[in-house]
């Protein structure tokens, strides 16, 4: 086991600070974060243009360097060398906690291997912020982050989360939201969901309902902003009065999904999931008529 005494005097190596930044509202930054950013020898940022806005707002003149997915190997080595030489580096992401859904994780691992102190400066986090306002269970949750861009890989990832009883937390971009909601309904079934948009910003919005309702909303809405999706875990079914397909025959049920853009095979699978019956039964009923 390696031991780190975070605030013990260290004269040899520097310190890597993981500094949380606001997820939208600049008033959410902490006094400690501002002090750390001012006192660091340099700030490593995912997008220097975005971080520069924050630094200018709080009159922070610390040297700013770029550290992102495409330069993480070369820049990561340079940052580690600086830390070994005794410099202090503050790592930030575009918004929220660094090392969450960004390459900061690799830098943390490298720093720990070199015996460099890694100190978190906590603050805003979109996932937890969305979760506590979702109305879904908070005692157990699993953070998934961004799903794969490709449909096949995205559906496979959702299949892997399907048995999870904990509340699920996803991030999604506006141009992929519709496809993601379609796949969630197909794979996970008609669970409760909270769609959180533009957290802490002027146009912050929460849409709470079922995945079926979310799919309908997304097909009609103009999708803008960054999204956090909080999805009910497996095992907590929608209340009986909310079973929207109860009045439909199996054939009408399949045709409903086809009208939403599902292929017949996908529609049959989803109907079987909704009704809790074998897929073969729905297939036979649908093709007999």
Swiss-Prot record:
It holds the Pfam family TP_methylase. InterPro entries: 4pyrrol_Mease, 4pyrrol_Methylase_sf, 4pyrrole_Mease_sub1, 4pyrrole_Mease_sub2, rRNA_ssu_MeTfrase_I, SAM_MeTrfase_RsmI_CS. GO terms for molecular function: rRNA (cytosine-2'-O-)-methyltransferase activity. Its EC number is 2.1.1.198. Keywords: Cytoplasm, Methyltransferase, rRNA processing, S-adenosyl-L-methionine, Transferase. It is found in: Cytoplasm. It catalyses: cytidine(1402) in 16S rRNA + S-adenosyl-L-methionine = 2'-O-methylcytidine(1402) in 16S rRNA + S-adenosyl-L-homocysteine + H(+). It comes from the Bacteria. GO terms for cellular component: cytoplasm. Gene3D superfamilies: Cobalt-precorrin-4 Transmethylase, Domain 1, Methyltransferase, Cobalt-precorrin-4 Transmethylase, Domain 2. It is an enzyme of class 2 (transferase). HAMAP family: 16SrRNA_methyltr_I. Belongs to the methyltransferase superfamily. RsmI family. Catalyzes the 2'-O-methylation of the ribose of cytidine 1402 (C1402) in 16S rRNA. This is Ribosomal RNA small subunit methyltransferase I. It comes from Halalkalibacterium halodurans (strain ATCC BAA-125 / DSM 18197 / FERM 7344 / JCM 9153 / C-125). The lineage of its organism: Bacteria, Bacillati, Bacillota, Bacilli, Bacillales. The gene is rsmI.
């Amino acid at each position: 086991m390696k031991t780190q005494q975070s605030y013990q005097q260290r004269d040899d190596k520097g310190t890597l600070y993981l500094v949380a930044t606001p997820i939208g509202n600049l008033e959410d930054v902490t006094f400690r974060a501002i002090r750390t950013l001012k006192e660091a020898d340099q700030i490593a940022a995912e997008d220097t243009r975005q971080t520069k806005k924050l630094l200018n707002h709080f009159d922070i003149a610390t040297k700013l360097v770029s550290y992102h997915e495409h330069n993480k190997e070369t820049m990561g080595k340079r940052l580690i060398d600086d830390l070994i030489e005794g410099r202090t580096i503050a790592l930030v992401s575009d918004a929220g906690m660094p090392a969450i859904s960004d390459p900061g994780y690799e830098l943390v691992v490298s720093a720990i291997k070199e015996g460099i102190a890694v100190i978190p400066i906590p603050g805003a986090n979109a996932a937890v912020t969305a979760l506590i306002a979702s109305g879904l269970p908070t005692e157990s949750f699993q953070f998934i982050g961004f799903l794969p861009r490709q449909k096949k890989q995205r559906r496979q990832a959702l299949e892997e989360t399907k048995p999870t009883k904990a509340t699920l937390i996803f991030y999604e971009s506006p141009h992929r939201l519709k496809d993601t909601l379609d796949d969630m309904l197909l794979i996970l079934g008609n669970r409760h969901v909270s769609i959180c948009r533009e957290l802490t910003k002027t146009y912050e919005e929460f849409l709470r309902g079922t995945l079926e309702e979310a799919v309908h909303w997304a097909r009609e809405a103009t999708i803008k902003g960054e999204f956090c999706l909080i999805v009910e875990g497996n095992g907590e079914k929608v209340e009986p009065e909310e079973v929207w397909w109860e009045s439909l025959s199996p054939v009408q049920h399949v045709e409903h999904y086809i009208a939403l853009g599902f292929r017949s095979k996908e529609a049959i699978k989803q109907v079987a999931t909704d009704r809790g019956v074998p897929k073969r039964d729905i297939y036979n009923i649908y093709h007999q008529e």
